[in-house]
Amino acid sequence: MSNTEKNLPTKYDHMSVEEGLYQWWLEGKYFEATGDEKKQPYTIVIPPPNVTGKLHLGHAWDTTLQDILTRTKRMQGYDVLWLPGMDHAGIATQAKVEGKLREEGISRYDLGREKFLEKAWEWKEEYASHIRQQWGKVGLGLDYSRERFTLDEGLSDAVNKVFVQLYEKGLIYRGEYIINWDPATRTALSDIEVIHKEVQGAFYHMNYPLTDGSGHIRLATTRPETMLGDTAVAVHPEDDRYKHLIGKTVTLPIVGREIPIIADEYVEKDFGTGVVKITPAHDPNDFEVGNRHDLPRILVMNEDGSMNEKAGKYNGMDRFECRKALVKDLQEAGVLVEIEPHMHSVGHSERSGAVVEPYLSTQWFVKMAPLAEKAVALQQKDEEKVTFVPERFENTYLRWMENIHDWCISRQLWWGHRIPAWYHKETGEVYVGTEAPADIENWNQDNDVLDTWFSSALWPFSTLGWPNEDAADFKRYYSTDALVTGYDIIFFWVSRMIFQGLEFTGERPFKDVLIHGLVRDEQGRKMSKSLGNGIDPMEVIEKYGADAMRFFLSTGSAPGQDLRFSMEKVESTWNFINKIWNASRFVLMNMDDMKYEEIDLTGEKSVADKWILTRLNETIESVTRNMDKYEFGEAGRSLYNFIWDDFCDWYIEMAKLPLYGEDEAAKKTTRSILAYVLDQTMRLLHPFMPFVTEKIWQHLPHEGESITVAAWPTVREDLQDTEAAAEMHLLVDIIRSVRNIRAEVNTPMSKKVQMQIKAKDEAVLAQLTKNSSYIERFCNPSELTIQTDLQAPEKAMTAIVTGAELFLPLADLINLDEERARLEKELEKFDKEVERVQKKLSNQGFVAKAPAAVIEGERAKEQDYLEKREAVRQRLADLEK
């Protein structure tokens, strides 16, 4: 990067800093994996975002963490591959494209499958471009030369091969099962596509008459329309109330069908009446009961949610219209005895908003138990297992894997991987293969596509060239090193990648899984359209820059925890960057055209020089160690404290003494240390704030083209000086204590005061005498006395630090009479406040009636006033000494 400016611009402007840098990085190919055999590979595949629109804050957080990892590893000398890509997102994208078509007054059926897919691909190209632009705005170091899409030809080949092999192993089968059905989009849904909402419904209590006329049996349901498909009534085998009825039959009201009373342990004796209706075609639990008792399955609804011919006179009605009509008929027949209001959780389609129907359907399934067993067994092998960070999520994962159900993988959509199965037009024979049958004219391909998660489960290896196991990238970069993702998709994605990786590559797809939480608003609420509390990361970047947003996102929570987003805290980070900018300007203005090779740390160093280099070593160690543990928050806080407190507030101020002095050797050493420390700090900070660190680094004396490929800092033992660090800590404690005393008595630093220091021994005396120039510079004493045998003067403010006592005579600091009068007035005020609040708290009526929070607030006030009153009393006592 050409750099003609000697100094940074006066003001930090994130927009001008970030403009053009990303394109410069791409042109330099700094993010492309090199395949250099001398370097150890490090691989992350990006969790592919859906090509459905804009990226949200969760994506920005997730990808920022990955960028921090890959930038750090690249600087540490690894051959880094961070592979980008996007997911076709079957139902989500199809819903968006269909919505766009509806605006034009046409449906997908008007277009036909091929034309509709052309529209979907047009959508994909448009939104993939938007996503790449957003990745660039965030500053993500992705290797675009290897970008993948789940419907790419190579990935589609992998999907077909996996389907066929699982089918041939008997692990994929076709059968009837209860699935989540969306009547609006007419497709099966995965569990993650079902949003559960609390809805006001009702329990409908009904009497089913015993067929022999000897009475009735009472039960309740929240979905009365499904009773039209009832094929049994069940009770618990140990329920004494109903034992005598087991084996008898009831007559289904309205329908008139005779159905058996069966015994099954699924029934809870203590819930409701202890009797449940069994509808095998419309409830997953009833389906299982039906299988155990060989009950018929009567489907009473069509795919669009209307009632079918099995529903009798309700045929053609919408399911909810049917509910109203049926309830009315049941009331008139005297069967419905009570409607009890009931709040309950009802599944809704994430895409259409329709109430999801448990629905009997012929679908394709993956037999999960054999695959899950291998994945669970892997976790017993310490060297081969997948490591979860935080560790507690391993138990979450294992519990789910040990209680897994077969996976419905077919979807009634057009956008996606079409199932590689064909049915013979005459014989009905099923053919499954990676290629179509030779006599294709005699076969019809299955119309369904695969669940999006099926292809996503292959993402870590299909993107690297599998099923060609000789592919260069697959051989070099698989298995991957880390996966960064949210805890909400451990079941739907992480687990499936693990068992598919084991089944088809024989090893774990990634070594570590770093789990983060969800982004919430400042009140801890999940961000949603309904609450209107969503925040566009591009707007945050526009206002405060990518660096500020990234630093907040990466340091705002611990692994596995949710993140409360705060625009105020992003602004605070912007202020931090502004401080870095101003400190960097100071350093650069004092470089005196220094070249990189002129940086010399061998000269004689002051205590401040030795201290800042020791603190830099400690910061390098802390940041590196915490990065290795995925503790980005801890790493970021180490950097923040070092930059803000040690470097900006202390060292730069202390560096002004030699810089503005006459000693040329001291000036040169100070310039070298300023340049070195700022260079090393920018490298440590670079993964968090790539833009501003590159900009500053380019202005510093440096070696190499870009900070993105500069070497990661390492601890230098030759620059470690713990004794000097201890000396500096004493100086800092003294200076802080003096500043605190001055603040306490409202005496400005510009006013000179006497200062006496009693050193505890000769060693401390020697230290303080040697470094007295710092005390004089930062404490502004009219006279400084340092001795080991000082007596405490009368009427002086004192402070005790490790190794010394400080005395500042009050007469120098304040007018004693005026201060005494002021403190007496303060004491009187606090006496009244204590009396008022104690009177309130002793009032039994107040304590009995006031909310707990109000009482707690008053008690806190009492404690605060008591402490302040005691401090004033102590100050008055000091005046009288």
Curated annotation (Swiss-Prot):
Database matches in InterPro entries: aa-tRNA-synth_I_CS, aa-tRNA-synth_Ia, Anticodon_Ia_Val, M/V/L/I-tRNA-synth_anticd-bd, Rossmann-like_a/b/a_fold, tRNA-bd_arm, tRNAsynth_Ia_anticodon-bd, Val-tRNA_synth_C_sf
Catalysed conversion reaction: tRNA(Val) + L-valine + ATP = L-valyl-tRNA(Val) + AMP + diphosphate
Chain residues that bind ATP: 529
Gene Ontology CC terms: cytosol
Motif 'HIGH' region in this chain: 49-59
Gene3D superfamilies xref list: HUPs, Isoleucyl-tRNA Synthetase, Domain 1, Valyl-tRNA synthetase, C-terminal domain, Valyl/Leucyl/Isoleucyl-tRNA synthetase, editing domain
Gene Ontology biological process: valyl-tRNA aminoacylation
Keywords, alphabetical: Aminoacyl-tRNA synthetase, ATP-binding, Coiled coil, Cytoplasm, Ligase, Nucleotide-binding, Protein biosynthesis
Classification via PROSITE patterns: AA_TRNA_LIGASE_I
Chain location of the short sequence motif 'KMSKS' region per the record: 526-530
Coiled coil (residue ranges): 810-881
Top-level taxonomic group: Bacteria
Cross-referenced Pfam families: Anticodon_1, tRNA-synt_1, Val_tRNA-synt_C
Cellular localization per UniProt: Cytoplasm
GO molecular function, one term: ATP binding
Enzyme Commission identifier(s): 6.1.1.9
Family (UniProt): Belongs to the class-I aminoacyl-tRNA synthetase family. ValS type 1 subfamily.
Free-text function comment from the UniProt entry: Catalyzes the attachment of valine to tRNA(Val). As ValRS can inadvertently accommodate and process structurally similar amino acids such as threonine, to avoid such errors, it has a 'posttransfer' editing activity that hydrolyzes mischarged Thr-tRNA(Val) in a tRNA-dependent manner.
Subunit text: Monomer.
Free-text comment about domains: ValRS has two distinct active sites: one for aminoacylation and one for editing. The misactivated threonine is translocated from the active site to the editing site. The C-terminal coiled-coil domain is crucial for aminoacylation activity.
The protein's name: Valine--tRNA ligase
